[in-house]
Amino acid sequence: MLSFILSIFPIVLLIYLMVKRNALPSYVALPWVATLVMGVHLLHFNTDIVTISANVVSAIIAVQTPITVIFGAILFNRFSEISGATNIMRKWLGNINPNPVAQLMIIGWAFAFMIEGASGFGTPAAIAAPILVGLGFHPLKVAMLALIMNSVPVSFGAVGTPTWFGFGALKLSEDMILEIGSITAFIHSIAALIIPLLALRILVNWDDIRKNIVFIYISVLGCVVPYFLIAQVNYEFPSLVGGAIGLFISVWAANRNIGLAKVTNTLDNNAVSAGEVVKALFPTGLLIAFLIVTRIHQLPFKAMMNDATIWFSTTLGSLGLFEISKGLIFSLKNIFGSNVSSSYKLLYVPALIPFVITVLIAIPFFKISSSNVKQILVSSLQQSKNPFIALIGALVMVNLMLVGGEHSMVKIIGRTFAEISGSNWTIFSSFLGAIGSFFSGSNTVSNLTFGSVQLSTAETTGISVALVLALQSVGGAMGNMVCINNIVAVSSVLNISNQEGTIIKKTIIPMIIYGIIAALGALFLVPLFYNL
């Protein structure tokens, strides 16, 4: 029990430090909590200093993935502002329909749904949120909406990575993974009838939601129906294709004012020409095109960018073995002589491609001056500084909580919760997945971490394995709402300072409601449609 208390205490302390009255910013709280976890390892778990040091170095390498994505997104958004593309898009969207509910659903729901399907890595909020701020919505509230909306598609984000890769270590059959995907989509589809309304409520009142409810559900079902149907036969494309279909349906319905209350257009949006719109949409279109062609494994680019064949290798003394692969994967292996390794996929991580490359292509296209290019670069680097410190703290904490295999702090937390709940595990299963996402920043990592705990709990209690693993995946997705990495990412892209605790206090409520919906769906609705 002492091991459980010491394992969960850092998470409880982190939440307290970030939501108390005079909350600490994440770039202060996370390094302090990471230091505490280090102390627990040394004093209670008797972990050797080499293992701890190796995991700290590994975390510093691993942090390059989220921070370069954040930098790339900031760079792209700063470019969009300075080039005038954001302003043209704002006017164009205002002309499609000035109703704020329509704009929030098109960009915050359907567009983000599609981007999640292509990329994951927190990019939907990073791309969609600045567009909404450009339309005049409050940045802090937009951050909350973006986090809450980006939950339903997450289990099939980055072309299904949380499902097929997240559960890959469990060596499940193809049919079992497909069944897990099917049940996951079913539970998400139920939640999708309620969660977008809670997200909208942050920015508009219930009366406006009621007046526009027909359009809201056209947009929701436009994404969710194809998403659910595709998940019956495939676990890679539900979010990508569902989001694309839903985006088309949402824009079509908004253009015709279907299900929307008439509102006065308060935007300063003189009619923009088709040429201006095409030019303004060019960077975003290029961005999406890069994401899609580099994520679909039927095309050759994904394999090329993930090619692990060694191209260059050298020993860096006691630090470890440094390697560069043909796919430009930079790796440091056997750090300090341990079995700890870390890597950074320069081409595959959505940073250089698509964000930086898109900006480099678009700069001459928009004839941006050298002084403005310098301003874009300098402001992007400055905006990335605090998230970098916060994410080093987060990843050191995560790495150390995973040290010890079956006896790691994370596994102790998971097993203790499972033992306490016993046969009632269906009710709590999704919340374990959410805890995984909260501290790790990823549905995929949550599934990798807790998949084995969920599997053994299901087998011990006699609950359906497919159902429990589906709830794990749903939990990992809903945990995106409160996930530290995503909150840091969207805050930094929108240039919001020291509001992480405020965001968590708002987003944790819909996350808990999501978990309750998942539990009720698993107990009462899933058995009606699935032979468990």
Swiss-Prot record:
The keyword Transport applies. It is a multi-pass membrane protein. Keywords: Cell inner membrane, Cell membrane, Membrane, Transmembrane, Transmembrane helix, Transport. The chain crosses the membrane at residues 23-43, 56-76, 101-121, 129-149, 152-172, 180-200, 213-233, 234-254, 274-294, 346-366, 387-407, 420-440, 462-482, 508-528. Pfam families: Lactate_perm (PF02652). InterPro entries: Lactate_perm (IPR003804). It is found in: Cell inner membrane. One of its GO terms (cellular component) is plasma membrane. GO terms for molecular function: lactate transmembrane transporter activity; solute:proton symporter activity. It comes from the Bacteria. Its main location: membrane. The keyword Transmembrane applies. Belongs to the lactate permease family. NCBIfam families: lctP. May play a role in L-lactate transport. This is Putative L-lactate permease. It comes from Haemophilus influenzae (strain ATCC 51907 / DSM 11121 / KW20 / Rd). The lineage of its organism: Bacteria, Pseudomonadati, Pseudomonadota, Gammaproteobacteria, Pasteurellales.
